């Protein structure tokens, strides 16, 4: 995956942390239709005082088999979250459901 040119060192560090978490997890392409519960993310945002410049991120993306549960959520810079989520989607969109994925890297 790629850093955005305009990302700050802090944003790049957040992307690195996310990438490491994905590499350390057992990730598999997963159909996410109907698996996202907006109430859970809204509750997590409120209960954990996530600032407005951050999204509630699934550390292991739902599209990679992560659970839609508070244990898999944290605050992440909006630009980092949305960019990495889209990049992951683009990388896996043509893979068959159930494809096991390995190491994720940033460049």
Predicted regions and their residues:
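Nuclease and nuclease-like effector domains acting on nucleic acids or nucleotide cofactors
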Residues: 1-107
């Amino acid at each position: 995956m790629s850093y955005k040119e305009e990302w700050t060192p802090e944003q790049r560090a957040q992307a690195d942390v996310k990438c490491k978490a994905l590499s350390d997890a057992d990730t598999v392409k997963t159909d996410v239709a109907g698996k996202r519960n907006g109430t859970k993310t809204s509750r997590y945002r409120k209960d954990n005082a996530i600032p407005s410049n951050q999204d509630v991120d699934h550390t292991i993306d739902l599209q990679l088999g992560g659970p839609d549960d508070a244990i898999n959520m944290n605050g992440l810079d909006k630009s980092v979250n949305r960019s990495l989520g889209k990049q992951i989607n683009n990388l896996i969109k043509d893979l068959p459901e159930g494809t096991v994925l390995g190491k994720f890297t940033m460049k």
